[in-house]
Amino acid sequence: GETISIYYDPGKFPALMPLKNGNYEERNGGVPQRGNITIHLQQFNEDLDKMTPDKNFGGIGVIDFERWKPIFRQNWGNTEIHKKYSIELVRYEHPKWSESMIEAEATKKFEKYARLFMEETLKLAKKTRKRAKWGYYGFPYCYNYTPNNPGPDCDAKAMIENDRLSWMYNNQEILFPSVYVRHELTPDQRVYLVQGRIKEAVRISNNLKHSPKVLSYWWYVYQDKMDIFLSETDVKKTFQEIVTNGGDGIIIWGSSSDVNSLSKCKRLREYLLNTLGPFAVNVTETVN
């Protein structure tokens, strides 16, 4: 769009792509330490030209890359395969090493090249679309209300790791934390989830010389119940948390599956007109 462009999995980041039979296929080496940066950047440049041909694009550019995290430890769940594969590569190369030595080497190699890919991608975006404001979706991560960290505060290790990602944040004009809430949480927990994530993003921003803006990704359905729109109370309280804790704005996100039928379109239109729209206007006027 003219105001905001979201680039989903752009370029050719190294990744292990899941196949229908349960196996994985290597894309550009599979993991950062085996990837070809030139191939990736060439493809990323082509993707930019295709999606945003206007070199004077002055809007917001969001790079939405979620195949793996640049912090080795944080690759769990869907991204854990990259961690396991990296460990196996070192084990194959050094069969006599201890497990701790193998993991340390895998961590070092992975994080070195993960940084290379993510940093050079940002730099190329900024070089070719100088007027746009760039950043990666989801960062900084907080991991509050997760199985290993069930409270409102961000995971202590993740906060230290966020400080280690200053190389990324120094190249971003905007931070894009995700504040999607879950139905399984209590109303108060939903508020605290948003509060914790905004506070961490603002903390990171305040620690940087150029103080990037904090624009939160907010979804109008519950992450674990995608057929239920956020209640009026949840809309009001989550918006208020973003504003009162130092957030600079909100990106209201939606999935194509939210509008893939006539009945869904009608439901969303009604929700926008009666619930979300009026409150969004109210918050905008208050902030301005």
Curated annotation (Swiss-Prot):
CC annotations in GO: extracellular region
InterPro entries: Aldolase_TIM (IPR013785), Glycoside_hydrolase_SF (IPR017853), Hyaluronidase (IPR018155), Venom_Hyaluronidase (IPR001329)
GO biological process: carbohydrate metabolic process; defense response; hyaluronan catabolic process
Gene3D superfamilies per UniProt: Aldolase class I (3.20.20.70)
Signal peptide (UniProt feature, chain positions): none
General function of this protein: Hydrolyzes high molecular weight hyaluronic acid to produce small oligosaccharides.
Protein name, UniProt field: Hyaluronidase
